[in-house]
Amino acid sequence: MFATDFVFPYMLSHSVLHGEPIYDRQWQLENIPAITGRGPPGEGIFYPPGTGFSTLPLAALSFSNAQLLWQALLICFVVLGTRALVRMWDQDEKRATWMAIAGLVLLSASIRWGMTHLQAAPLIMGLLCLFVVCIDKNKYLAASAIATYVLIFKFSVALPFVGLLLARGRWRDVAVAVAIAGLAQVAGFARVGGIAAFSDYTQGIAGLEALGSINTPDPWDPMSSPRLDWTYLYTGLIGVPEIGRRLSQVTTVLVAIWLSWSMWQLRDHLDRHATATILLALTCFGILCVYHHHYDLSAALVSLMMLGIMHLGGIINLPTSFLVLTGPLAAMIALLPLATVQGVLLSVGGPRAAGYLNIAFPISVTLALIASCLDLQRLRSDDRPEKPPLSRF
């Protein structure tokens, strides 16, 4: 009935609850089918054990019931997060408005990608909406709790949460969140096998991006599932994964320095426009510098919605260049019927044609990152068309 990606958090929670050696491949082959009724993950489990704490209550249910509840939670967080975000601008907003926007978000391509696989991406998107609202209302305890949860669940998508807290000078909150998340991972490894579990986990991670798998860094590989990171982009352009990784690392360092400097320059001018632009930059940068698949694009919906609401509402006036550069990403997130387009391209042009679609993902994210960087530069120079100042966070 559903895709099998929910197997990963469920089995991690089950193993943490019962003290099972989740990273032992033989144990996976023998026990995962018995517990879930599904086959074992073909390429192992790549989530750290601390993830199991974030979904621990679900392990008390059977796999089928937990899966249904998980899907309901994904939908609820998308709807509640969207509602909270829309109401940031008008507490008296008519119910029909936020309901219509939430409906469009649920129908968007990126949310469908996550829902199809029962991935956590829709949950992260909803949590990011709630996080931004908490920051807007100076509810830093709640914001820090959300950031801590995301760090425990999937630290690779936590940069927008951590970055916004740092931009607001909440260094202590970030330190506490990172410490708690780190302790959760240590406790998780201790619970599922200690040093042996850590060794098995690191061996599995080493093979995460194996050529010929869905996680391959080569977008021209027929087995490839679309990825978003610079390693994927550079490998597609150059053809050598190792060089692609090196170029990705260099690009990551340079962009990180530039973004850090820009955020520091804007630390006393964090109105909603600046915050939304920083959020877009952090979201794009976070998914470009680390391995991610296409469904993780849904987090970019948050900043794009914020900027779109302000632009369409006449609060800010985004330049044409910004709209052009973010247009491809917005179109893919909103409309792209990925499986259908992949099927058409494969039938017409073969794997090579499908490869062009794969490589379009990191290109579109990079263009949106460039757009956000240019907007940050305009904000830094205070050379931007804007209506009366927005309320500060």
Residue ranges of model-derived segments:
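Hydrophobic alpha-helix-in-membranes signature
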Residues: 47-48, 56, 121, 154, ...
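Aromatic-enriched
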Residues: 308-393
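Membrane-embedded alpha-helical segments of transport systems
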Residues: 152-155, 183-187, 330-335
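Primarily membrane-embedded glycan-assembly and transfer machineries that use lipid-linked glycans
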Residues: 1-143, 165-297, 301, 388-393
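Long, hydrophobic, well-ordered secondary-structure blocks that form the structural core
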Residues: 78, 149-166
